[in-house]
Amino acid sequence: MPRSCRDCLPMMPTELSAVLPARHIQEECGVFGVYAPETTDVAPLAYYALYALQHRGQESAGIAVNDDGVFTAYRDVGLVNEVFPAERLRSLGTGTIAVGHVRYGTTGSDNKRNVQPILVNHYKGRMALAHNGNLTNSHALRQELESQGSIFQTTTDSELIAYAIAQERLRCRSVEEAVCQALR
C-alpha cells in the first residue's frame, strides 16, 4: 500500500518542469458551433462564444447561420465586437445551426479571403466549415489538387478540408459519412 501520494506518482509536480517544454502561449483559432432543435436566434449564441474565445485569435471573425439549408453569413477582419455590431448580428437571422470562427493565422495570409467560416457550394448542397489547426501535408496536398485542376479561393489549409468533404459527398449518402471519409 502506498504511504503517500509521492509513492503513487512517477514525478512530483515540481519535478515536471525539468521534462516538460517551456510554457508559452501557443495560440490557434477559436471555433464554436451550436445546434438548436427548432429555429431560433443562434447567431447571438455564436457571437458570445466567439467573444469568449477571442483570445484565441484576433485577426478576424465570422459566423454562418443555417436555416433549413439556407445560409446567411458574415465574415471580416477585426475583433468580434467590431465585425458584429448589433445590427449586423441581427441581419444573420434565425436558424437551427450556427458556426463561428476567430482567426489566429498560422497558414495563409491575413486577408479577408481567408476569414472563416468558409462557405462552399457543391454538387450535393452547401456547407459552412470552420477549422482550428494545421494540416501537416497541406502544401503537398494543395499542389496535387491544383495539378488535377482544382481551384482554390483562399490560401488556408481549411479550404482543402472543405474540398475533401465535397469530393467524398459525391460518393456518400450523407454529409456525416462524407466528413468521416474525408478525414480518414
Per-region residue spans from a language model:
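Conserved short alpha-helical segments that host acidic/polar catalytic motifs at enzyme active sites
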Residues: P2-R184
